[in-house]
Amino acid sequence: MNSSTALMCFALLLISPLCLGYSDEDREADSRRIAEIIQNAQDDDSKINSTQELLDIYRRLYPTLSLEDRENIDKFVNEHTDAIVIDGVPIQGGRKAKIIGKIVSPAAKGLAVGFFEELGSKIAQLFTG
């Protein structure tokens, strides 16, 4: 009985990575989506509105990246976001962009556009190089 249970657990460990994760197809789809986002974001408002989608793609890609790549992009993102902490614990979602909002001043809009362009460039490099 013990050996059959152990064998079953071992089989599940071998099979589970095949069912979960970030497949090559997912990576290719995200690569195309990054290129599409960058190409279609012509004006400042569309760039600002597309920033969250870039961050979502980065979060999906995160487990497959090298430690150096993760630290590089995390440092960049953390410099441009504030942690929202209640009683020392981040709220669900954890971070809020400093530079993105419904009404953005011209100076903040420039920062938001710069953030979008730099983040898009960093993520696109992960797919091309």
From Swiss-Prot:
Places the protein is found: Secreted
Q: Which GO terms describe its cellular component?
A: extracellular space
Q: Glycosylation annotated at which residues? A: 49
Q: Which domain of life is it from?
A: Eukaryota
Residues of the signal peptide: 1-21
Listed InterPro entries? Turandot
What protein does this entry describe? Protein Turandot A1/2
